[in-house]
Amino acid sequence: MTAPSQVLKIRRPDDWHLHLRDGDMLKTVVPYTSEIYGRAIVMPNLAPPVTTVEAAVAYRQRILDAVPAGHDFTPLMTCYLTDSLDPNELERGFNEAVFTAAKLYPANATTNSSHGVTSIDAIMPVLERMEKIGMPLLVHGEVTHADIDIFDREARFIESVMEPLRQRLTALKVVFEHITTKDAADYVRDGNERLAATITPQHLMFNRNHMLVGGVRPHLYCLPILKRNIHQQALRELVTSGFNRVFLGTDSAPHARHRKESSCGCAGCFNAPTALGSYATVFEEMNALQHFEAFCSVNGPQFYGLPVNDTFIELVREEQQVAESIALTDDTLVPFLAGETVRWSVKQ
């Protein structure tokens, strides 16, 4: 006789860092998020980036048009910060509940970030306005100087950009997104109530050995890049400790297969279909399932000053195999953990 499956019921989660792209890709990937999550912070790094209220409103509508009937999902829009952004435009979007937050990409740090910020001084009037109105700043925390090793970019960002910024604007709410190092985990843990972080499933489950030993695995390649195991362990300990200023942010970032499996492949893991079960696996491995719901469904809304979702979902603990690929116009998408057997999945 087969033992009954273990079921884990939690308040509906939110994804506080998500890439949905646009066009056919958007239509393909939105349902994988909207069937599970109540809300998601949608990244603005389209081409061209989302820098105006009108662009955000139009993008939000394209997202909503792709949400299947029966899914109750709210996209939370963000503004892409540039050196030339008008603070008045940002404040208008925030006051009209179009922009939930603004995103700081250092120029050329990741996909479609060539329009990003060249220096903090260049956007200081914008940041001062954000501090004044209580608008959160979302930060891709890596320096991009050519002489700095890719594995050191996050730690160097803390000392050269993040800490001086927070010393200068002490009331600014900051989310240090997709942190990947012990340095960042310690920095956020030791910070005040105006500093929080998101962490992806891939940075909790894997380290750079998994990506590079025995062959290059392009579908584990993302930015910030996977680090050594001591950093992975620090992240696992932070999220499963019950610390309340770290929350779910998948950084799900879809690219067509041919753009990942190439001589110069794109960075990003399409983890929306498998992320929640992956997080549950980590919490179970760390004997910390009692903190799982807070990480997924409570800590984020608390930091943003939003209500928690009033519906619930269930995860079931039974082995399931992840699809090898997902159909996309003229190509396919390879999901995170493609072809692998996973322990936890969302109950349908």
Swiss-Prot record:
Task: Quote the catalytic activity from the record.
Answer: (S)-dihydroorotate + H2O = N-carbamoyl-L-aspartate + H(+)
> What does the cofactor section's free text say about binding?
Binds 2 Zn(2+) ions per subunit.
One Gene Ontology CC term in the entry: cytosol
| Protein residues bound to substrate | 19-21, 45, 140, 223, 255, 267
* Organism in which the protein naturally occurs: Shigella flexneri serotype 5b (strain 8401)
**What NCBIfam families does its record include?**
pyrC_dimer
Tell me the cofactors it needs.
Answer: Zn(2+)
GO biological processes: 'de novo' pyrimidine nucleobase biosynthetic process; 'de novo' UMP biosynthetic process
What is the protein's name according to its record?
Dihydroorotase
- List each coiled-coil range: none
